[in-house]
Amino acid sequence: LGQNVEGSREFTGQYETYYENLEIVNRAVNMVVDDSATVNTTVKPVGHSGVVKGIKRAKIENLLTKEPNPFQDISTFKRNLIIDYIIDGNIFIYFDGISLYHLPAHYVDIEPDTKTYVQGYTFQTSIDYNPREIIHIKENSFHSIYRGTSRLKAAQRSMSQLTRMREFQDNFFKNGAVPGLVIKSPSVISEKNKERMIQSWMTRYRPDGGGRRPLVLDGGMELDAISNVNFRELDFESSIESSEKEILKVLGVPPIMLDSGNNANIRPNHRMYYLETVLPIVEKINRALERFFGFAVTPDISNIPALQPELRDSAAYYSTLVNAGIITPNEAREALNY
């Protein structure tokens, strides 16, 4: 175990910019965040003690399902946590003995220890916390056993390309949407007159200002184009679509879920999205909370429409066990969260 202070490996500001400015990133991240935050939590007794002692189950249940602190509801609290998880790759929660508070991950440094794994946490380089006050949820990472890596890192190339394509389109139309042109003159023109002609062209010939006004070229002047611009190619439609699909794949959102129209395969993709993207995030958070508080924290999927077939299969399975006398009806109800 190393002893160097572990801060954010990535400059998360670029990911925050992509999240705020790119429609596909904003929509996909919000889908994962909102869907993960709406998965209900069930708190049950478990056969081991947690990091903190002496807290009753009713208190933990209230913190994790209703009011984590006096200032936030559970939905807002969870959404803040999961946004940090996707953007930074880490979640830090401070427990003061009464309430839970979210610490923005990019402000938190981890101080490793060769014997106890973590010596402490520092917030904004000035506020110190001991490991018994912090719940840390880490995203997968190859480079560090302490900090996770942002999910958006793998999509950085696609997001950068998408941004540059959009900027090119914006600049093209901002500059008048005029292809490169050359006016040929049979005689030498002074620099002053050249500038006047350029300004006259920019003022009169602006398609973005309401149309093309005809120009009269006299004195033997000719008009020629230096670039063959295909306006359809400027849409970058196929390239944009390809980049968007790559971003969705990195975030674990099936592209079909954002396509318009009726899709016959939407149901299995919706199910796969919950099983492979949403529930793994929820489980990682729950396992960290379970270790910290010493209570079993499990997701309640009974109200998730995409997972109703799994509930039917589970109900049939437990009914078979009850009918065979292997478990009691009460044990089956508990397993099904009823």
Where on the chain are the PLM-derived regions?
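Small/polar glycine-rich anion-binding or flexible loop at a beta-alpha turn
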Residues: N262-N265, V297-A306, A335-L336
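General structural feature for long, well-ordered alpha-helical segments within catalytic domains
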Residues: N193, M197, W201, S243-E244, ...
